[in-house]
Amino acid sequence: MPRPGKSSYSEQKPPYSYISLTAMAIQGSQEKMLPLSDIYKFIMDRFPYYRENTQRWQNSLRHNLSFNDCFIKIPRRPDQPGKGSFWALHPNCGDMFENGSFLRRRKRFKVVRAEHLASKSHQMIHYFHHPHNQTKMGLPPSEGSPVPSLGRLPHFQSYNIGNISGNQTSGFKHPFAIENIIGRDYKGVMTGGLPLASMMHHLGYPVPSQISNMVSSMWPHVGMMDSMATMTVPQEYGHFGVPMKTLCHGPSQTIPAVPLPIKPTASLPPVSAIPSLAVNPSIMCPSPPAVAGTLLEPAISQPENKSSMLHSVLVHS
């Protein structure tokens, strides 16, 4: 189909797409780039059909400029008068139209997204603002600001992971650490020397001789309690099977609060009934007589109260 002349499109719509009209205007310019206003002016001067309903087709043309890779936006230089950016054709889209005819567009031009957009923009500005480079079809190598590598951010400093871990472990204590689990009364003992060795000593685990000597020198009550014989438990309490150690000590000796673990037996036999409990003062810690008397008074006076109440009930009945 021969290319129609200018006079044959008087009032009818020309058979060109908006991409073809824009490319026609850009290629017809001297610098091969035009602002948006000059593209509108070229189309209206060449095709009288577009002199009406300007707002409708101009919106469509702007949409094609923004969403087609064959057009690139060139910022205006400070020394150039006017406002708005320039629009130009991508240097690699020369074969977009078949045989140079704007009526036949071979394919839609696509730019590979893997290209660095920053470097491409710099190359396009350099290409279109220097006329001696326009004769080349390929882009010149970029000389100037190097593009930073994608796999590395230069503004981040390298940190020593070993130092970070060391600082965190020295200043941070886990909430489930032994110092946080035990009560307040035991914190002084735990921070005063060898807490692990003392607890192993209480639990009966073998402790090296050096650590055992240090424990005995720092906490003499630990060896004292282990050396004292285990108290005898009455036969009626044999079902419970809980070994008890004497904790009595002299009034002049001060013993820090140390947790004493209790090791219950694996299984307990069923207890049908507990016999009458009798208080044996010999297994208790020595205490003043006045305190012992006050403790035994309720146990002695209880049978007398029961017998008097029974007698009063029989009399009134």
Curated annotation (Swiss-Prot):
GO terms for cellular component: nucleus. It comes from Xenopus laevis. First expressed within the dorsolateral ectoderm, except for the organizer territory. During gastrulation, expressed in 2 ectodermal stripes adjacent to the dorsal midline. With the onset of neurulation, expression shifts first to the neural plate before settling on the bottom of the neural tube, on top of the notochord. Expression is then absent until stage 35, at which stage a pair of cells in the fourth rhombomere in the dorsolateral outer area of the rhombencephalon show expression. Keywords: DNA-binding, Nucleus, Transcription, Transcription regulation. PANTHER family: FORKHEAD BOX PROTEIN (PTHR11829), FORKHEAD BOX PROTEIN B2 (PTHR11829:SF215). It comes from the Eukaryota. GO terms for biological process: anatomical structure morphogenesis; cell differentiation; regulation of DNA-templated transcription; regulation of transcription by RNA polymerase II. Signal peptide: none annotated. InterPro entries: Fork_head_dom (IPR001766), FOX_domain-containing (IPR050211), FOXB1_B2_FH (IPR047389), TF_fork_head_CS_1 (IPR018122), TF_fork_head_CS_2 (IPR030456), WH-like_DNA-bd_sf (IPR036388), WH_DNA-bd_sf (IPR036390). Transcription factor. Residues 13-107 bind DNA. This is Forkhead box protein B2.
